[in-house]
Amino acid sequence: LLTNILATHQVLEACQKNNVPILLTSTSEVYGVAEDEVWTEESKSLIGPTTKLRWSYAASKMIDEFIALSLFEEGKISPIIVRLFNTIGPNQLSQYGMVVPKFIEAALVDEDILIHGDGSQSRSFTWVDDVVNYLIKLAEIKAYGEIFNIGQTEEITIKELAELVISKTNSNSKIIYKSHEEVFGKAFEDPKRRTPDINKIIEFTGMKPTKKIDFMVENIIDFKKNS
């Protein structure tokens, strides 16, 4: 929490001092458990209570955004803010709980694939190359003072993701389920779905995401087999 807020504030102050623009990476977590069908940049945030400690990350990222935008309004810095939605790629580590590499690594050795909850929660995964291309384009067009969702609109449930991974790897893995409380304790809350509206970034950049989940999973499988 403090690392996100204090370190970001120091970077923003350095940008102000040296008159350097900044591209600030925020997160889809700032929307919390908002019930909108898809989340636009203007959707209201609905994060959980302070007793659910997992929301500290979302809260710290929201504060980062507030600081950056307040400094922009004062004419002190030139920020571009992006909210990333479940970025994945071939070299992503599973040790921090990233679901796609975690499932693939288990499937490649026929281990059980563990799903937290009932697997009906859905996510929208975005290929890392698409994310990088968006970041470069936003910096080039100098979209200062703006907030953008960066993500893919294609949804998949976590259960469907596990089944896709098993199919693509020809694995003998079984899917097992554990409740969020059993894995993380009572101080955890998980959004049921997380899908971005990306009309704004398409309008500003003229670009759409290029990769679908089948490609992403196949690419990561090939990478892990050969690394």
Placement of each model-derived feature along the sequence:
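C-terminal "lid/loop" region of Rossmann-like NAD(P)-dependent oxidoreductases
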Residues: D118, I147-F148, K159-A162, N170-R193
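Conserved cofactor-binding/catalytic machinery of classical short-chain dehydrogenase/reductase
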Residues: A7-Q10, P21, E29, S45, ...
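Amphipathic terminal alpha-helices
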Residues: N199, K211-S227
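Non-catalytic, hydrophobic alpha-helical segments
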Residues: V131, L135, I150, L161, ...
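Active-site helix of classical SDR
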Residues: S56-S60
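Conserved C-terminal active-site "lid" loop/helix of NAD(P)H-dependent oxidoreductases
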Residues: V128, E182-K208, K212
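Active-site "gating" loop of Rossmann-like NAD(P)-dependent oxidoreductase/epimerase domains
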Residues: L6, Q16-K17, T25-W55, S70-G75, ...
